[in-house]
Amino acid sequence: EQYLTTQDTASAHLHVSESDTEFVVSGSNFEYIFDRNTGNFTDIVVDGQELLSAPCDKTIWRAPTDNDRNIKNEWLRAHYDMISERTYETGCIIKDGCAVISCTSSLSAPTVQPVLRINAEWIITPEGTIKSKMHVKKNAEFPTLPRFGVRMILREDMRNVNYIGMGPYES
């Protein structure tokens, strides 16, 4: 694969490569690959270990519970269970010593107008921290979302994992 541009930051050990299909951001102990076609990370490697067992993706679906019985059929009519992401534009710049990947995309079901329009930024620090900022606009013609999130399917052997689902505070 031929890379179009390569850029090192003034900060220690942050390297960014760009091709037609991906951005590769690497530092002293990490390498992250962002797929420009899907708008998601495909590889997150830290200390030589791949953390993902599948590429990341954005999702709104979850299995309905008994409490969802009144809205479940609306979710199914809206085809929320068949949602996929369409990526329109991606970019990567160096800002304040960090790599900033931007992505404009939408989530929609086949033959249905977009449910969500997403402007996402992924900020990667020279130490390997990934921060996300997303502006998500829901189409008012669709029912309430079951959920919205980024799915990261981790390796099965990972046992000690922390995450923040709805922010850093109790929810």
What is each PLM-predicted segment?
Residues Q2-S171:
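Beta-strand/loop-rich accessory regions of lumenal/periplasmic or secreted enzymes
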